[in-house]
Amino acid sequence: MTGRIHSIESFGTVDGPGVRLVVFLQGCPMRCLYCHNPDTWKINGGTEMSVDEILAQYEKNHVFYEKGGITVTGGDPLVQITFVTELFEAAKSRGIHTCLDTSGILFRPESPELVLQFDRLTAVTDLVLLDIKHIDPRAHIELTGQKLDFVLAFARYLDKRSVSVW
């Protein structure tokens, strides 16, 4: 399985606990006015990489990551949910802490098929950095071009699943 990777930061200290390998994925449905990664918006940008290639990057510096792990961010990593799930499943099989940095904008509680995908992903996610862009619904649309509803639905879903959230 491959994903579209914007970049990889080998010594991340602000994207979850400890020192982390931070993987920035391509693709984001939001158009945040203050976005510091607008070059991640398009899904076809970046470089194609496999799960094994990313884990090989982790292994190069694994001694630094022992109290940290892997964080996947973007863009919004949920654009590539199947890839992230496979990466996290492989990471968890190696005892690596997993962290997902997302707004949750792509969560759709009315879609049973999508909820099953989220169930599979959250089963191997240790921590979610939930990026709520604005709490006011109108301001959220102005800021991101997207409704707040799905973000809040994702927050409720994470709570029901007892997923740790920062």
Protein language model features and the residues they cover:
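Conserved alpha-helical substructure of the radical SAM core
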Residues: 38-70
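Auxiliary Fe-S-binding modules of radical SAM enzymes
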Residues: 1-20, 55-56, 61, 160-164
